[in-house]
């Protein structure tokens, strides 16, 4: 794999290779070329012409199959309305290329790398092909290191791996978007990194809401677009399956430039990885492949692996990926989520119960998991503190039924103490976010891992049993708890 992306765009060869459409079936086109002039698999083809109403047509498609008799089968990445047989098709001679570099920050792109935010064209100067090989073995960074987020519940209980892949599970309204925006903000401030957001097959309204919220929270700076911390790439659910299948690759290509050339740590968000699989399933059926288990494409494992293996740490930098995972009918054995799980290093589950209590971020400390939470990776102190927190919360959960009916008085002295500490831990796991300042009025807090461990050790040891529960709610480090308790007592 070449470290530096190509500095050339999708340039059209001097000798034009032109074919013509022989068949159109929805988003799938069959195109015939002259003998010996067949385009390669994944080459980008452009259909230009006029429809019957005299309107200009410009449709880009990607070669998927070579059929024989000088014919290829291609999948369109935009609507095929108005296309007719015998229209001319131009072979660009290369896969699609998209803009990369700092010029992409603060902008919204489609799958072809075209800006769709009405702020004019992107003057990137650099482009890179969306189909690239994963880094070779010798380029990989094999050292296991924690990616510190500054979010207490994540760093302590479900630490993220630098260059790892994290699954984000949660229904509507439990705080996925705010958590994503806080991570984007923190990687920029604490790590000097940038983020790329790939909206794969989700609702257009959600993409617009995210963009507006990012502008409001200054993750995207309207006044000075160059100071923005994120590039957005959208292929929404109203677009053809060819676009939805490739938008993840477009976002990843932009992220790879920041990793390989700028040598930065990058956060790549994919929302939703299930829609990537779904689009691949549609394309597979349209291409006439025999379906596999539950109707999915037979190439499911290969397609997922090709995308996921490009997301990794190299000796230059890292791409840490957070992927929202939709689980169809809550069936974790469905081939789409099951294939995704094989690639994940951690799972972050957002709980509606915690959100209802007003505890944000609403990360479920018992359901969320991480392969990094091992004593030989995070150290004995971190591991033992995390296990102590989990055991206390688990015991509190077991006692809920007794508390609900006979009440706290029926518990033993030891259990009452456990409940009191668990309630303090639960509140201390909440945290004010920088991106939520405009809504809450509370200044955001970045808490280092060292301070996080110290705070929870003090709660578990009983050093703070005398402080009121409310003092632990929506604060940063443990010193703020004592200060808040003093303020509340003086107010009383």
From Swiss-Prot:
Alphabetical UniProt keywords: ATP synthesis, ATP-binding, CF(1), Hydrogen ion transport, Ion transport, Membrane, Nucleotide-binding, Plastid, Translocase, Transport
EC class name: translocase
Residues that bind ATP: 170-177
GO BP field: proton motive force-driven mitochondrial ATP synthesis
Entry-linked CDD domains: ATP-synt_F1_beta_C, ATP-synt_F1_beta_N, F1-ATPase_beta_CD
Cellular location(s): Plastid membrane
UniProt keyword GTP-binding present: no
Domain of life, per lineage: Eukaryota
Reactions mediated catalytically: ATP + H2O + 4 H(+)(in) = ADP + phosphate + 5 H(+)(out)
GO MF entry, a single one: proton-transporting ATP synthase activity, rotational mechanism
EC annotation from Swiss-Prot or TrEMBL: 7.1.2.2
Pfam families per UniProt: ATP-synt_ab (PF00006), ATP-synt_ab_N (PF02874), ATP-synt_VA_C (PF22919)
Primary subcellular site in the record, as a coarse category: plastid
Keyword Transport attached: yes
GO CC terms in record: chloroplast thylakoid membrane; mitochondrion; proton-transporting ATP synthase complex
Membrane topology, from the record: Peripheral membrane protein
Alphabetized HAMAP family for the sequence: ATP_synth_beta_bact
UniProt family annotation: Belongs to the ATPase alpha/beta chains family.
PANTHER family for the chain: ATP SYNTHASE (PTHR15184), ATP SYNTHASE SUBUNIT BETA, MITOCHONDRIAL (PTHR15184:SF71)
Subunit structure: F-type ATPases have 2 components, CF(1) - the catalytic core - and CF(0) - the membrane proton channel. CF(1) has five subunits: alpha(3), beta(3), gamma(1), delta(1), epsilon(1). CF(0) has four main subunits: a(1), b(1), b'(1) and c(9-12).
Role according to the record: Produces ATP from ADP in the presence of a proton gradient across the membrane. The catalytic sites are hosted primarily by the beta subunits.
Name recorded for this polypeptide: ATP synthase subunit beta, plastid
UniProt source species: Aneura mirabilis (Parasitic liverwort)
């Amino acid at each position: 794999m070449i470290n530096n992306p190509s500095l050339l765009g999708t340039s059209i060869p001097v000798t034009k290779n032109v074919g013509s459409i022989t068949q159109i079936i929805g988003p799938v086109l069959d195109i015939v070329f002259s003998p010996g002039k067949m385009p390669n698999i994944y080459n980008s083809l452009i259909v230009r012409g006029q429809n019957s109403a005299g309107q200009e047509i410009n449709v880009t498609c990607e070669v998927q199959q070579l059929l024989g008799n000088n014919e290829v089968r291609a999948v369109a990445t935009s609507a095929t309305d108005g296309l007719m047989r015998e229209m001319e098709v131009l072979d660009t001679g290369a896969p699609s290329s998209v803009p990369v570099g700092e010029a992409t920050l603060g902008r919204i792109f489609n799958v072809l790398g075209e800006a769709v935010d009405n702020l004019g064209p992107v003057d990137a100067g650099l482009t890179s092909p969306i189909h690239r090989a994963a880094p070779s073995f010798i380029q990989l960074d094999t050292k296991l290191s924690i990616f510190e987020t500054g979010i207490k519940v994540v760093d302590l209980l479900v630490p993220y791996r630098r260059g790892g892949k994290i699954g984000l599970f949660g229904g509507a309204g439990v705080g996925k978007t705010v958590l994503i925006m806080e991570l984007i903000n923190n990687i920029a401030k604490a790590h000097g990194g940038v983020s790329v957001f790939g909206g794969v097959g989700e609702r257009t309204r959600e993409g617009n809401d995210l963009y507006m919220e990012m502008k409001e929270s200054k993750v995207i700076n309207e006044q000075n677009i160059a100071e923005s911390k994120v590039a957005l790439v959208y292929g929404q659910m109203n677009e053809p399956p060819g676009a939805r299948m490739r938008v993840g690759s477009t976002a990843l290509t932009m992220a790879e430039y920041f990793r390989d050339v700028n040598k930065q740590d990058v956060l790549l968000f994919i929302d939703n990885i299930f829609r990537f699989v779904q689009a691949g399933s549609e394309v597979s059926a349209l291409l006439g492949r025999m379906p596999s288990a539950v109707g999915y494409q037979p190439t499911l494992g290969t397609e997922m692996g090709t995308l996921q293996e490009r997301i990794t740490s190299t000796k230059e930098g890292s791409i840490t990926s957070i992927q929202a995972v939709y689980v169809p009918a809550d069936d974790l054995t469905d081939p789409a989520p099951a294939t995704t799980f094989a690639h994940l290093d951690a799972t972050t589950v957002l709980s509606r119960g915690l959100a209802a209590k007003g505890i944000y971020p609403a990360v479920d400390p018992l359901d969320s998991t991480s392969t990094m939470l091992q004593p030989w990776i995070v150290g004995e102190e971190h591991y033992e503190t995390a296990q102590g927190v989990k055991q206390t919360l688990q015991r509190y959960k077991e006692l809920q039924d007794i508390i609900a009916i006979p009440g706290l008085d029926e518990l033993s002295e030891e259990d009452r103490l456990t409940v009191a500490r668990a309630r303090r831990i639960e509140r201390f796991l909440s945290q004010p976010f920088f991106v939520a300042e405009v809504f809450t009025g509370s200044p955001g807090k970045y808490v280092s891992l060292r301070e996080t461990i110290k705070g929870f050790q003090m709660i578990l040891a009983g050093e703070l049993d005398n402080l009121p529960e409310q003092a632990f709610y929506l604060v940063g480090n443990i010193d703020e708890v004592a200060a808040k308790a003093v303020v509340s007592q003086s107010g009383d």
